[in-house]
């Protein structure tokens, strides 16, 4: 798996070990498939809404507004997040960004107006870690999910960083 990101894993990854070919089960399968992933995403999404730093009590006006005034959109967000996890975990479902961007997942445009700071991103990542622990996801799979999430930190925080750079100029 060296040199391969989570997003590049195929449904079944074939690796060579000791001269023999082994088929490794995809992260998608090890997580339990779409229904298990959807349960984790639903729990995680609800936890983020309740998180005092990044949810309804956030001091970030954009995050506060999203988590109070846009909750009718939460089921759709849970669906999109589920597709995203299934996709990056090597499952059969494909995530398609609702707004085009610099990468196939285009997270920078979806998050730009939220102005998510790096510290706020880390709080969301910690919430994801707690959710994975709640569901007793094994360490290997937990680490892979968190690595896939962390790989998009610069995209998600781009709006904050651009705003901070403009304010400093």
What are these regions (language model features)?
Residues 3-169:
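Core of compact, soluble alpha-helical bundle domains
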